[in-house]
């Protein structure tokens, strides 16, 4: 099965972090191995740039993400923020998920009909399918 990865999920996957749960890691690895790919919302790339600028993430995190997104063998592909995502956005309750990037990531998963791999408890309570 393919999936949409939350920002922290893709960054932890790419750095082989122990923060990533075993279930999350298996989900990503299985999708990549079986050539189903995993999706990363374009907003995650923007969010990573912002966090590097704010010095909350090292530049290497952004470099790994950009490298994965440009390497077809990585199995990580970008999911655009498009009209379908905008149409799905009202289905992500703002009172449960107040952060706009998180709402966009959740709406991307909903629009694509894929589970969202996330540790974020707010997203896990947003009424969408999640994996952790």
What are these regions (language model features)?
Residues 59-63, 73-119:
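Active-site neighborhoods of divalent-metal-dependent phosphate/nucleic-acid chemistry enzymes
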Residues 1-40, 54-67, 112:
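Short, well-structured N-terminal submotif of metal-dependent ribonuclease cores
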Residues 40-42, 118:
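Short beta-strand segments
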Residues 48:
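Phosphate/NTP-binding elements of NTP-utilizing enzymes
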Residues 68-69, 89, 123:
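A generic structural signal for nonpolar/aromatic side chains embedded in well-ordered alpha-helices
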Residues 52, 70-75:
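Helix-loop "lid/cap" segments that line or gate small-molecule binding pockets
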């Amino acid at each position: 099965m393919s999936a949409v990865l939350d920002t922290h999920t893709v960054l932890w996957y790419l750095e082989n972090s122990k923060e990533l749960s075993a279930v999350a890691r298996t989900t990503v690895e299985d999708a990549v191995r079986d050539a189903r790919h995993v999706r990363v919302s374009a907003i995650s790339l923007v969010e990573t740039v912002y966090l590097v600028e704010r010095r909350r993430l090292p530049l290497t995190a952004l470099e790994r993400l950009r490298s994965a997104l440009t390497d077809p063998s990585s199995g990580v592909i970008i999911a655009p923020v498009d009209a379908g995502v905008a149409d799905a956005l009202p289905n992500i309750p703002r009172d449960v998920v107040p952060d706009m990037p998180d709402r966009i990531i959740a709406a991307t998963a909903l629009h694509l009909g894929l589970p969202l791999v996330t540790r974020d408890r707010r997203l896990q309570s947003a009424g969408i399918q999640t994996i952790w």
